[in-house]
A protein has these predicted regions:
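Catalytic cores of DNA base-excision repair glycosylases
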Residues: 2-158
């Protein structure tokens, strides 16, 4: 691990490069509802942004709530989300998550990381994204690329 002086140096450099950066809670949501934000994040896993956007548009035209989603067949969901890839696993997770939201969370997206990660298809990174951009909590989504950079800087252990 590097010492605090190294971290402070990097922070000051980045702050000078990005003077308008704000650490305030974000106001905008990814989509208009927490549910569609959650499903959008689930669809984004291992997918390009363009393909995720197409899949979201197609899926949310059919269903944009857990109540509506569980009325779709897995095949209907697969056809809608096909552009995002991994459509078999994602469709199963979307249906299972929608059912779980209705059965265990009164149809609402939970606002704790532990509860989010109990949903099928939601891991640490996805839950961090939802916590940050849906609920405005100070979470940072760390993917393999961010972790690799932090490891090379000596700020993270393998």
């Amino acid at each position: 691990m590097k010492n605090n002086n190294d971290i402070k140096f990097i922070y000051e450099k980045l702050s000078s490069l990005y003077p308008n950066y704000s650490n305030k809670k974000p106001k905008a949501k990814i989509y208009s509802k927490a549910y569609t934000s959650l499903i959008g994040v689930m669809l984004s896993a291992q997918s390009q942004d363009k393909r995720t956007a197409v899949a979201c548009r197609q899926l949310f035209a059919l269903a944009d709530s857990p109540e509506d989603m569980i009325n779709l067949s897995q095949e209907e969901i697969i056809e809608a989300i096909r552009p995002a890839g991994l459509f078999n696993a994602k469709s199963k997770n979307i249906l299972a998550t929608s059912k779980m939201l209705l059965e265990e969370f009164d149809g609402r997206v939970p606002n704790t990381q532990k509860e989010l990660m109990s949903l099928p298809g939601v891991g640490r990174k996805s839950s961090d994204i939802v916590m940050r951009f849906v609920f405005g909590e100070p979470h940072i989504a760390v993917d393999t690329h961010v972790f690799r950079m932090l490891w090379r800087l000596g700020w993270a252990d393998s």
